[in-house]
Amino acid sequence: MSLNKVILIGRLGRDPEVRYMPNGEAVCNFSVATSETWNDRNGQRVERTEWHNITMYRKLAEIAGQYLKKGGLVYLEGRIQSRKYQGKDGIERTAYDIVANEMKMLGGRNENSGGAPYEEGYGQSQEAYQRPAQQSRQPASDAPSHPQEAPAAPRRQPVPAAAPVEDIDDDIPF
């Protein structure tokens, strides 16, 4: 038995870029920063930031492209996937990407482009979009290929206001 699951909460380092593959499916790419802080042996505060390349597909990609913005806080679930490429120096390298299949926008209006503080989850919808497309394959024709229309995204549910948390470091590395 094996498991490949990644859960991240971080801030977008750039606005998402959405492209469309020849078959009409959307692909979205962006980066997310996660940080951890600790005190070293001398009592000095140390921070390390990791950057993660995120890829999303289909309807989730379109939603991310529409609603996520640089600096916004986001919760992501997915899997890690490696890919090999050749660097400018000719050496083969390996990159690791997170293929996200669930997303929740965290924070309020200023964090992303939503209204009051909302939490939006689209993970289950993503799986629903994969299945019908696989079942309804049609022979190729001269007409352009379009993804199957999917049900509307879940309604926004207000998140109750949380009590302020002490000692939060709001330094964003971008």
Curated annotation (Swiss-Prot):
Coiled coil spans: none
InterPro entries membership: NA-bd_OB-fold, Primosome_PriB/ssb, ssDNA-bd
Motif Important for interaction with partner proteins: where in chain: 169-174
Low complexity: compositionally biased ranges: 147-165
Domain SSB: 3-107
Leader peptide range in chain numbering: none
GO MF annotation list: enzyme activator activity; single-stranded DNA binding
Region (Disordered): 108-174
UniProt entry keywords in alphabetical sequence: DNA damage, DNA recombination, DNA repair, DNA replication, DNA-binding
GO CC entries: nucleoid
Polar residues bias (residue ranges): 123-139
Alphabetical GO biological process terms: DNA recombination; DNA repair; DNA replication
HAMAP family associated with the record: SSB (MF_00984)
Record protein name field: Single-stranded DNA-binding protein
